[in-house]
């Protein structure tokens, strides 16, 4: 599965020697999509694919840090994912909880700053609490900036931004002209 998720420029195992240095992007964004279909194509349950994808996120973070990539964004759960079968949503939330338990260790090891974007209000309280804890604990880290998009969708983001702007206009905080 590693080759399935590994971008071509990460295939080189080492760039420690000066003559092997390569140009790397400053920011990589990854949409965690297709893990369920991948598992199904292998005769495994969809949740197995989601779990394998989550395991690879830690590897990707370490590789990005090692290569000097400054920003990594992972689209982990979109607003559209709520329409999946409830047992799959529950499994994804369990996976998120488990990942967040180990995420702090990975962040400390790789000097990662963790930030979560998206509408976290519908998430369970324990997940929201863990998000706040991770963001606060890693706020001063200077290595890889790791952004996790949870309950995120571009339409939803634009809708929330437009509503906030309208409220700010009504409150007199912003001039509509």
Tell what function each PLM region has.
Residues 4-177:
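Flexible, compositionally biased loop and terminal segments
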